């Protein structure tokens, strides 16, 4: 089973590496993990940081201009492979380690 984590980002140069490193470290026992980044037209150095750290995610899709979180989420859903899908904001508001609790249900 694939557990897809969609990460919509907009101007997250200060937090993007930390969140992606935390997601990469997640060790699911029952799921194969898929990390999808959606760059929602960032105008800071987020795009450059993502391009320099491709080993931290499985795929990236970009919107040329900022269309809002809803558009980023919809784009991510179009490209996911997972049977289970979650959204992880890049601003570190939620602890990525909490995603491991999903395995307790299965």
Where are the model-predicted features located?
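Short aromatic/hydrophobic "clamp" motif used to bind/position activated sugar donors
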Residues: 85
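Catalytic metal- and UDP-sugar-binding loop of GT-A-like glycosyltransferases, i.e.
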Residues: 63, 88-90
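Short, well-formed alpha-helical segments that are part of the catalytic scaffolds
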Residues: 12-26
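Conserved donor nucleotide-binding strand/loop of the catalytic core
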Residues: 33, 47-79
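Donor nucleotide-sugar binding loop of glycosyltransferases
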Residues: 12-15, 42, 69, 95
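Cell-envelope/extracellular polymer assembly enzymes that use nucleotide-activated donors
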Residues: 2-4, 34
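Conserved donor-nucleotide/metal-binding helix-loop-beta segment in metal-dependent transferases, i.e.
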Residues: 99-106
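A conserved acidic beta->alpha catalytic loop
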Residues: 39-48, 92
């Amino acid at each position: 089973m694939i557990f897809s984590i969609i990460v919509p980002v907009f101007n997250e140069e200060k937090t993007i590496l930390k969140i992606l490193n935390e997601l990469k470290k997640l060790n699911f026992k029952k799921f194969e993990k898929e990390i999808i980044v959606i760059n929602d037209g960032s105008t800071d150095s987020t795009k450059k940081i993502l391009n320099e750290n491709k080993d931290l995610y499985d795929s990236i899709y970009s919107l040329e201009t900022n269309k809002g979180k809803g558009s980023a989420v919809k784009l991510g859903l179009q490209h996911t492979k997972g049977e289970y899908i979650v959204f992880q904001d890049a601003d570190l508001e939620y602890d990525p380690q909490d995603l491991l609790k999903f395995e307790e249900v299965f």
